[in-house]
């Protein structure tokens, strides 16, 4: 699929701004949506809409089946072992908060350490800060060098017998650093420390295999990978979904409610309280299909090639490393309206 053909899949690019074709370079913030995703949301509301997991009428059965089909597609897409390991959330932020809250409540005590890096987005720092305030945990920061890379030997030195969680980004949203996940997870396994990966930038630009990565948790932001807003995914190993307590209380996450006792459903229902984002979940299946078929979306070499072409134009300079360990280095651009790099047009 050529680039022009890919761009034609997005209705928003039919418009012009100030007489010029729309050029959008903010997908790391939020990606535009292909027509297939937009159409699927409309189709679902027009023909199949119902709440899921609550009723047995025809529309409810259809909606529930579509909802659960997407869970199976996600499982396959990231190569999870069990469908119970796929939990739908409101976003990657909620996915990380879910882990910090439930794991923290059960396993973190005063003085325990949580190891993050200096590259983390607020979404992978603030939830752990809450644990620091609530439980007396200690947050340790693994430093990075001037190119935004971590030194794995220095990283090892930060791990102690009190380390109870390692949480870090897959790909930095600032520098484009691709983190050495497998080196960290291999190290963590020897010490029985769970690892959470913030995959907000990693999921749209990687061929994901969570079993190969060896992480315990992986958070995904769907609106950054051609999907609808207000939807995220938490991958959590079955060991953890079986052990962790519910995150929120409400309909759909219980087996039985009595006046003096409540029994909870198994995962994933245990972590999906209340009315879910049904249309968004159903439409996200189309997003994954698009990402799978698109030769640019999930191949880091395409993004790396783009950044190298931009730098080669001599109109930009990298503010971080331009090595193969980086997806897209942070760059500064200097141009006049008549000298926009050809890679942008």
What is each PLM-predicted segment?
Residues 1-296, 305:
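Pyridoxal 5′-phosphate
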Residues 298-345:
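Low-acidity, Ser/Thr- and Arg-rich intrinsically disordered low-complexity segments
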């Amino acid at each position: 699929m050529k680039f022009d053909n890919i761009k034609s899949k997005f209705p928003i690019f039919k418009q012009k701004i100030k007489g010029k074709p729309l050029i959008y370079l903010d997908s790391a913030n939020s990606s535009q949506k292909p027509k297939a995703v937009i159409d699927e949301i409309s189709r679902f509301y027009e023909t199949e809409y119902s709440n899921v997991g609550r009723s047995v009428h025809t529309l409810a059965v259809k909606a529930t089946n579509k909802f659960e089909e997407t869970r199976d597609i996600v499982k396959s897409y990231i190569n999870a072992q069990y469908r119970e390991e796929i939990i739908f959330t409101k976003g990657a932020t909620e996915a990380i908060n879910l882990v910090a809250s439930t794991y923290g409540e059960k396993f973190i005590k005063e003085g325990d350490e949580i190891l993050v890096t200096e590259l983390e987005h607020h979404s992978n720092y603030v939830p752990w800060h809450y644990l620091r305030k609530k439980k007396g945990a200690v947050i340790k920061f693994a430093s990075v060098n001037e190119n935004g890379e971590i030194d794995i030997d220095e990283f090892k030195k930060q791990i102690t017998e009190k380390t109870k969680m390692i949480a870090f980004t897959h790909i930095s949203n600032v520098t484009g650093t691709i983190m050495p996940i497998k080196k960290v997870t291999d190290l963590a396994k020897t010490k029985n420390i769970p690892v959470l990966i913030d995959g907000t930038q990693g999921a749209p630009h990687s061929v994901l295999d969570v079993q190969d990565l060896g992480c315990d948790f992986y958070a995904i932001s769907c609106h950054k990978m051609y999907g609808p807003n207000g939807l995220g995914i938490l991958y959590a190993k079955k060991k953890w979904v079986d052990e962790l307590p519910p995150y929120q209380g409400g309909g759909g996450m219980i087996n039985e409610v009595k006046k003096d006792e409540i029994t909870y459903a198994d995962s994933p229902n245990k972590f999906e309280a209340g009315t879910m984002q049904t249309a968004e979940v159903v439409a996200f299946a189309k997003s994954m299909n698009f990402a799978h078929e698109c030769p640019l979306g999930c191949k880091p070499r395409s993004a790396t090639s783009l950044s190298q072409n931009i730098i080669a134009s001599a109109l930009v300079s990298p503010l971080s490393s331009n090595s193969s360990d980086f997806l897209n280095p942070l760059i500064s651009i200097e141009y006049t309206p008549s000298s926009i790099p050809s890679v942008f047009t």
